[in-house]
Curated annotation (Swiss-Prot):
It is found in: Cytoplasm. Pfam families: Mur_ligase, Mur_ligase_C, Mur_ligase_M. Gene3D superfamilies: Mur ligase, C-terminal domain, Mur-like, catalytic domain, NAD(P)-binding Rossmann-like Domain. Pathway: Cell wall biogenesis; peptidoglycan biosynthesis. HAMAP family: MurC. It is an enzyme of class 6 (ligase). It catalyses: UDP-N-acetyl-alpha-D-muramate + L-alanine + ATP = UDP-N-acetyl-alpha-D-muramoyl-L-alanine + ADP + phosphate + H(+). It comes from the Bacteria. This is UDP-N-acetylmuramate--L-alanine ligase.
Length: 465
């Protein structure tokens, strides 16, 4: 590719999916440029690596580019897209560019409705501990690496495979993981769940004859597609028929202790440095791959025991002063689907037994809130106190019956929690100051702008003091 393409431009370079690819390409020696609507830590990092960053979208930004990379979130009338089309500069979908990177190495693609980022991070960490030095492209910041992407010297590239727009069908990895299959992003599949499951089957058909599909048999929808997978299958999970499974699971001090049972191998005692049964499952996927690739048991144990997590995935901010003179434990999480939220809440209950759980939640997308409305009511009713914001639209038109206020009214009618509704994320710190008290566990949650709240909370409390 390099003899033809020397300069690659990214429209929306600050996004999690785009920035990782841009960083790997920059480290491979390509000239990288990009634009976004605002600066953030990611754009600053890319600039330090030599990328040319423009704030705002303008036709002039693509000057000199041999290819322009876009995601499905970029509109066709974007001025940079229009300029590329006018100049006959190739416009490349993000997943197609990721597929090009995978052609340079042996790809390990992590798919599933939930858990992709954490599982990708665990796989990358375990392979790194085993000396395989993988390249990785992750949808969140791997805390130990301080980045969401890295160019390694080894044979493997580990990356997330995105089913939300069916773009994972562009990838041709040698190992695939399917963590679970759930109803999300259903607009892509015509609101037909059978079409979604068929897409995952087609994803496995991208594997070569020597490849393998590593699948979580605890998920009933994954279990249903196994008979239709024609390539070798490795089953992992907590189920008795899992080939890589966890037994004797014990949650202690925010960690998960368990024994790994693998066919033809001695039992392996593991301590995972993060809470939650769902993370045990995610770790089992990494263990299955690492075992297949010859990583030692010692390296597996070390990587999982020292795993520092991923940004915004049950990310701990430590103790924050509460308005009553005490302090509460602050956690931030990206969860935005009821299934993910339930797993995070269960993990918090297990990690902090007996403590009051306060959730500040920003719903993400009106269509998701509409499609999962009753499930949101059910999961949000399981916390002890709730601050709820208006929906983060993500470019969608408002749906009055699926607004934050409508969700708040439904929760109040259900009678299990009395939500404090705030119109904007900017109001969350004030609301939490009134709700949170000494000894609480406070979780800020959502895929939108609420991710900026935790860093403001300490400053907010100090200003109020």
């Amino acid at each position: 590719m390099k003899h033809i393409v020397k300069h690659i431009h990214f429209v929306g370079i600050g996004g999690a999916g785009m920035s990782g690819i841009a960083e790997v390409l920059a480290n491979l020696g390509y000239a990288v440029s990009g634009s976004d609507l605002s600066r953030n830590a990611v754009t600053d990092r890319l600039e330090a690596l030599g990328a040319r960053i423009a704030i705002g979208h303008d036709a002039a930004n693509i000057e000199g580019a041999n290819a322009v990379v876009v995601s499905t979130a970029v509109r066709s009338d974007n001025p940079e897209v229009l300029a590329a089309r006018a100049k006959r500069v190739p416009i490349v979908q993000r997943a197609v560019m990721l597929a090009e990177l995978m052609r340079l190495k042996q790809g390990i693609a992590i798919a599933g409705t939930h858990g992709k980022t954490t599982t990708t991070s665990l796989v990358a960490s375990v392979l790194a501990a085993g000396g395989l030095d993988p390249t990785f492209v992750i949808g969140g910041r791997l805390i130990s690496a301080g980045a969401n992407a890295r160019l390694g010297t080894g044979d493997f590239i580990v990356a997330e495979a995105d089913e939300s727009d069916a773009s994972f069908l562009n990838l041709y990895p040698v190992i695939e993981v399917i963590t679970n299959i759930d109803a999300d992003h259903m607009d892509t599949y015509g609101h037909d769940f059978a079409r979604l499951k068929q897409a995952f089957i087609e994803f496995t058909q991208r594997l070569p004859f020597y490849g393998s599909a590593v699948v979580c048999v605890d998920d009933p929808n994954v279990r249903q597609i196994i008979p239709f997978i024609s390539k070798p299958v490795v089953r992992y999970g907590l189920s008795p028929d899992a080939q890589v499974r966890a037994e004797d699971i014990d949650a202690r001090d925010g960690r998960m202790h368990f024994t790994v049972i693998r066919e033809g191998r001695a039992p392996l005692a593991v301590v995972l440095n993060m809470p939650g049964l769902h993370n045990v499952q995610n770790a089992l996927a990494a263990i299955a791959i690492a075992t297949d690739l010859g990583v030692s048991d010692d390296a597996i144990q070390l990587a999982l025991a020292e795993f520092n997590g991923v940004g915004r995935r049950f990310q701990r901010y430590g103790e924050v002063p509460s308005a009553d003179g005490g302090q509460y434990t602050l956690i931030d999480d990206y969860g935005h689907h009821p299934v993910e939220m339930a797993a995070t809440i269960a993990a918090a209950r297990g990690a902090f037994p007996g403590r009051r759980l306060v959730l500040a939640f920003q719903p993400h997308r009106y269509t998701r809130t509409r499609d999962c409305f009753d499930d949101f009511v059910n999961v949000l009713s399981t916390v002890d106190a709730l601050v709820l914001t208006e929906v983060y639209a993500a470019g969608e038109a408002a749906i009055p019956t699926a607004s934050g206020d409508a969700l708040s009214r439904a929760l109040r009618a259900a009678g299990k929690v009395d939500p404090v509704f705030v119109a904007t994320v900017d109001d969350v710190p004030d609301a939490l100051a009134k709700v949170a008290r000494n000894g609480d566990v406070v979780i800020t949650m959502g895929a939108g702008s609420i991710g900026g709240v935790p860093a403001k909370l300490v400053q907010h409390i100090q200003q109020k003091a």
